[in-house]
Structures are given as structure tokens and as C-alpha cells.
């Protein structure tokens, strides 16, 4: 089982009384409230924590990207990826992911990701995403073309990595007279591609058709099972049998020496949930054209005041339903066993620290995960035969039916 560490890198150093009446801080909360000293401290503390995650035995560090909001300080995912490529030695650098449809020039992503893969000596997982509705506004992109731009940018990215140039690209959204990137990834034919999401049926089906792992982002156990059912059905229709190596799961998990302290820190996830989801503006989160009509219906009802806005599940209920797992190492392992037995992912990302959890508590959480939780999870993974794509040598994709390889003579 592939075990990753994740944090949104949220920034809480702003005057909360400056937030508008609707409570949202995404997109239109003025950056006059940004504190660059606090921002510098945050980045450097996160780097210490990432290095610690490698030291204690995590297999990967998961990174993501958001814009114009304090809930996520990762505005450029490839910047952090390049930092980790140089600052770490062993751990996989897992991007979940590069928001392809927001890019007017996907070839720049192809080049920068290739550089990260070479600097890291082949440790990149080049995950891709559509980007949330809010990201379309932040990047000045028409949301109506998001999905088709996602598919086309993906095809262009893969071709740029694998087909020698120069050649011309003429598509409905992108046109390039010359495609001939000199730098291509170290991994051949290209790095693995994983796709995260929150249950969009179209994306799940597409992932299964491509043989890409789909990583569920903190979905409920029941929703996760429904996702796997759709993935498995789509995989069967594509002519193969899916397994744990195609299933990923991101879950909020916080560990401390005492249950009392773990629960107190885990309550900070609710601050994060308010920043990100509970107070997300419905118009910005789901702009016209971004989602399918069926997926957009609940949002339209809220906008037109024909339905109440969804409220975050109370903290205690999230603990009960394993949406949040917090406690001592033994308590956390016991609860994660239930989740692993129910959902059977080969890829598990532990969303360890967020909100206003201190740097020292974050480090202690990572240390306890490494000493007690990760070894127990590996034993459970072996017991349940939860193999990840690297362990089974899973095919890269439907297009490339082999595992990525690092050429002979590459630096060790």
C-alpha cells in the first residue's frame, strides 16, 4: 500500500473580523490582509514537516493547487514539487494535481513537470485535475469548456512527452505550430498519472477507461463504495479487472500522544471545512457550464433559494462516520482498519495537519504516524492484499501497457 502525507497548507494569519458577511475568503477576500512574514514562516515550516515525513517512512508527499484563498498556500504546484525534488531523496512527489484546463499553454506544464521528474531522479507522479469552479474565475478561464480542455490538454501533455517532435497540434482549444519540447521526463514512457476527485461520474468513467487510479477526496465510506462500483463497471467495459491499485483515498487523520490532545487539534479540520467547503460560495463553486446538468441541479436550487445550503456534518458525527480519524496511534490504527476493510484502497493519503494546528504538534503527529501508524497500516495492507501501482507494476495506462521505467545510466 502506498502511504502519503498531505496538508492543504492553510494560512490563518489574517484578521477574521475583516471577512465579509457571507463568511467566504475564497476569490474576493482582499490580499491586503496577507502577511508575508507569516507566509514565509508557513512555507519553511511545511518544508521541515515534509522532510520529516520522508524520514519517518511515508512513501509519498501529496501536493495540490488552489488560488486566491488563504485555505491553500500552494498557488503553483510545480514550485513545491521542484523544491521537494531537491530537498528529498526517496519519497514520491505526488501532484493531485496540475489543473490542466486552467492553463492556456499546457506545453509549459509538460516542460516543468519533466524538469521535476529529472531533478527528482524519477520520483514524480504527475496527477491532473479539472480544477474547481472557483479556479476558473481565478485563472480567467471559461468554465463551459473546462472538461473538453481537460481531455485535450491531457492528450497534448502525453503526446509531448512520448512522441518525438517537431509536430503540429490543432485542436478545438489549443493550437501550436511547433511542439518539440527538448526536455522530457526521466521516467519512460512518462510518469504515472493519477486523478483525484469528489465523485464526478464523467471523470470516474474516463479514469477507468485510461486505467488511471482515481483518488477519492475525503468522501464518505458509502460514497467511496459507489465510486468504486462505477469504476469497476467502467473497467470491465474497457476489458480489464480493476483492483486496489486503481483506488486511492484521502482521509483526515490526526495523531497525538493523548486522545484529548488529538481531538482538540482535529477540531481544526472544522475551521478548514468552513474555509473550503462549508462557506464556499455556490455561484463561484459551480459556475454555469462547469458541471453536467445533473450535477449542477442542487447548486441551482440553492442559488434560487429553493433548497437550503448544505451544512458541514458536526464534528462528533464526522468522527463517528470516520470522516475524521483522531486519537492515539492505537485508536487511529483501529479505526483505519475498519475504513481499509470497507473501501480497500491501494493508495492512502493521510491528511494530517490543518487549520491552526501548531508546527510542533504537526511534527509530533508525523512522528507518531511514522513510528506506530504506518507500520501497522502496512501489515493491514498485506493482510488485505491492498497493493499499490508500484508494487504490482501496473500498466501506466490503456495507451502504454507497461510500468514506467528509469533508463539505464540515470543518476541513483
Tell what function each PLM region has:
Residues 4-34, 147-182, 223-345, 374, ...:
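An alpha-helical appendage that flanks or caps ligand/catalytic pockets
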Residues 199-223, 227-228, 232:
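A conserved active-site cap/scaffold subdomain adjacent to cofactor or substrate pockets
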Residues 28-44, 97-107, 189-199, 253-256, ...:
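Active-site mouth loops of central-metabolism enzymes
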Residues 60-80, 100, 137, 219, ...:
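Glycine-rich, proline-tolerant flexible connector loops at the mouths of alpha/beta enzymes
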Residues 54-55, 81-90, 113, 117-124, ...:
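Acidic (Asp/Glu)-rich catalytic clusters
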Residues 3, 53, 57, 65, ...:
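Conserved, mostly hydrophobic/aromatic
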Residues 1-91, 189-191, 388-392, 403-412:
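N-terminal beta1-alpha1-beta2 module of alpha/beta enzyme domains
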Residues 3-7, 61-63, 93-96, 124-128, ...:
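Hydrophobic faces of well-ordered beta-strands that scaffold small-molecule active sites
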Amino acid at each position: 500500500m502506498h502511504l502519503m502525507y498531505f496538508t492543504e497548507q492553510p494560512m490563518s494569519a489574517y484578521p477574521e473580523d475583516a471577512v465579509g458577511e457571507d463568511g467566504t475568503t475564497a476569490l474576493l477576500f482582499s490580499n491586503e490582509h496577507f502577511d508575508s512574514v507569516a507566509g514565509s514562516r508557513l512555507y519553511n515550516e511545511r518544508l521541515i514537516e515534509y522532510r520529516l515525513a520522508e524520514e519517518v517512512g511515508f512513501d509519498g508527499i501529496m501536493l495540490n493547487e488552489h488560488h486566491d484563498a488563504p485555505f491553500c498556500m500552494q498557488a503553483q504546484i510545480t514550485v513545491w514539487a521542484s523544491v521537494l525534488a531537491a530537498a528529498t531523496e526517496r519519497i514520491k512527489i505526488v501532484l493531485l494535481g496540475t489543473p490542466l484546463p486552467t492553463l492556456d499553454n499546457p506545453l509549459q506544464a509538460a516542460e516543468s513537470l519533466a524538469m521535476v521528474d529529472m531533478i527528482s531522479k524519477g520520483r514524480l507522479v504527475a496527477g491532473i485535475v479539472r480544477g474547481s469552479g472557483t479556479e476558473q474565475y481565478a485563472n480567467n478561464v471559461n468554465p463551459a469548456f473546462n472538461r473538453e480542455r481537460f481531455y485535450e490538454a491531457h492528450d497534448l501533455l502525453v503526446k509531448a512527452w512520448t512522441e518525438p517532435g517537431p509536430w503540429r497540434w490543432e485542436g478545438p482549444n489549443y493550437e501550436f505550430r511547433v511542439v518539440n519540447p527538448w526536455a522530457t521526463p526521466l521516467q519512460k514512457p512518462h510518469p504515472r498519472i493519477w486523478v483525484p476527485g469528489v465523485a464526478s461520474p464523467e471523470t470516474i468513467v474516463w479514469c477507468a477507461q485510461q486505467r488511471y487510479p482515481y483518488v477519492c477526496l475525503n468522501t464518505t465510506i458509502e460514497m467511496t463504495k459507489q465510486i468504486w462500483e462505477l469504476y469497476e463497471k467502467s473497467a470491465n467495459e474497457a476489458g480489464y479487472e480493476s483492483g486496489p491499485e486503481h483506488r486511492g483515498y484521502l482521509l483526515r487523520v490526526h495523531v497525538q500522544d493523548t486522545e484529548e490532545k488529538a481531538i482538540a487539534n482535529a477540531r481544526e479540520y472544522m475551521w478548514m471545512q468552513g474555509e473550503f467547503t462549508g462557506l464556499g460560495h455556490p455561484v463561484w463553486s459551480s459556475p454555469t457550464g462547469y458541471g453536467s446538468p445533473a450535477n449542477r441541479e442542487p447548486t441551482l436550487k440553492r442559488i434560487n433559494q429553493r433548497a437550503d445550503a448544505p451544512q458541514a456534518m458536526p464534528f462528533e458525527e464526522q468522527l463517528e462516520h470516520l470522516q475524521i480519524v483522531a486519537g492515539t496511534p492505537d485508536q487511529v490504527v483501529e479505526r483505519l482498519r475498519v475504513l481499509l476493510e470497507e473501501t480497500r484502497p491501494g493508495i492512502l493519503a493521510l491528511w494530517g495537519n490543518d487549520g491552526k494546528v501548531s508546527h510542533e504538534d504537526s511534527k509530533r503527529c508525523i512522528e507518531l504516524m511514522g513510528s506506530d501508524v504506518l507500520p501497522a497500516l502496512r501489515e493491514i495492507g498485506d493482510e488485505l492484499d491492498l497493493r499499490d501501482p508500484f508494487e504490482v507494476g501496473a500498466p501506466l495506462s490503456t495507451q502504454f501497457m507497461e510500468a514506467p521505467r528509469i533508463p539505464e545510466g540515470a543518476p541513483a
